[in-house]
Amino acid sequence: MNYLVAMEAAWLVRDVDDIDDAIGVAVSEAGKRLNEAEMDYVEVEVGATGCPACGEPFDSAFIAADTALVGLVLEMDVFNAESPEHAQRIAKSEIGGALRDVPLKVVEVFETEADEDEAEAEA
């Protein structure tokens, strides 16, 4: 089975004054580290947090003392996994290897369609 695994990462950015700068730096640094590990197939986006008062989503970023904590969402397709749990372990191992010392948490796993070549091979 094929799965899309979405993970949340907590990215620390130092010496920033602005939320938008912190988000840009976090996405850029994460993308750079993934590309250096030849993992350009991992999607990197800023996460969203729901407002406790109105429920409206806003960017997951917070600045205190010129240091930002940015919540990133990392998505990776995992092919030929035996189960959703197996897909989670594969994704966490792959991404965790490239992003050492970055806290990761699996937030969702979706089963995806097999592409046409795989569907024909299984038939």
UniProtKB/Swiss-Prot annotation:
For this protein, the record's Pfam families field holds: DUF555 (PF04475)
Q: Which InterPro entries match?
A: UPF0212
Highest taxon of the source?
Archaea
Task: Please name the HAMAP family in this protein's record.
Answer: UPF0212 (MF_01223)
Recorded family membership: Belongs to the UPF0212 family.
Q: What is this protein's record name?
A: UPF0212 protein rrnAC0441
Species annotation: Haloarcula marismortui (strain ATCC 43049 / DSM 3752 / JCM 8966 / VKM B-1809) (Halobacterium marismortui)
